[in-house]
Swiss-Prot record:
Region spans: Disordered: 1-41, 131-151
Name of this chain's protein: Small ribosomal subunit protein eS8
Biased composition range(s): Basic residues: 8-26
Naturally occurring in which organism (per UniProt): Oryza sativa subsp. japonica (Rice)
BP-aspect Gene Ontology terms: maturation of SSU-rRNA from tricistronic rRNA transcript (SSU-rRNA, 5.8S rRNA, LSU-rRNA); translation
Length: 220
């Protein structure tokens, strides 16, 4: 028995009479879910659908294009982990990529962009006193590198600095090298796992959810 989307085989809750039986039709078929897994062995299948159109069924993915809305920048980055799914915990346990799943993505491409755009290296950890001396030597190298920048570039960076704002939660995440993001594409339909970085109220909401989940896990 294939998966069928017709209502012929369903009984009426009211006890009403069923339609006259007929065979299944091609346009009533259903396909099993893609259940796209997080894996470095990227696998995308081509599916021919109604009207001769094509869908791309992603079976395994580990990268996607993620946009940082407040900075209006998009970068291709690695998906590191699936951490939350509002509909099903099983999809988190099995690391399944679906639309609206909350994932952790690699912060490196965004960190690099931020450094070139604003001249600010975000997410650097505070140094211990012993490590400070080594850091001073590195800072001296950095200053010589900074001296290489032309006056025009320096002026441009200073101008950008004036309107710069960075959410404390996002800065904290840059420190760990992982950013919380939401998948907004449908991997089983278009073969991609693209999305956006969580910010503001939405980020706070999901951070609370994850904290609560962590608390439950510790108490169990």
């Amino acid at each position: 028995m294939g998966i069928s989307r017709d209502s012929m085989h369903k009984r009426r809750a009211t006890g009403g009479k069923q339609k006259a039986w007929r065979k299944k039709r091609k346009y009533e078929l259903g396909r099993q879910p893609a259940n796209t897994k997080l894996s470095s062995n990227k696998t995308v299948r081509r599916v021919r659908v109604r009207g001769g159109n094509v869908k791309w069924r992603a079976l395994r993915l580990d990268t996607g294009n993620y946009s940082w809305g407040s900075e209006a920048v998009t970068r291709k980055t690695r998906i590191l982990d699936v951490v939350y799914n509002a509909s099903n915990n099983e999809l988190v346990r099995t690391q399944t990529l679906v639309k609206s799943a909350i994932v952790q993505v690699d912060a490196a491409p965004f960190k690099q962009w931020y450094l070139t755009h604003y001249g600010v290296d975000i997410g650097r950890k505070k140094k211990a006193p012993a490590a400070k001396k080594d850091a001073e030597g590195q800072d001296a190298e950095a200053t010589t590198e900074e001296a290489k920048k032309s006056n025009h570039v320096v002026r441009k960076l200073e101008k950008r600095q004036q309107g710069r704002t960075l959410d404390a939660h996002i800065e904290e995440q840059f420190g760990s090298g992982r950013l919380l993001a939401c998948i907004s594409s449908r991997p089983g339909q278009c073969g991609r796992a693209d999305g956006y970085i969580l910010e503001g109220k939405e980020l706070e909401f999901y951070m609370k959810k994850l904290q609560r989940k962590k608390g439950k896990g510790a108490s169990a």
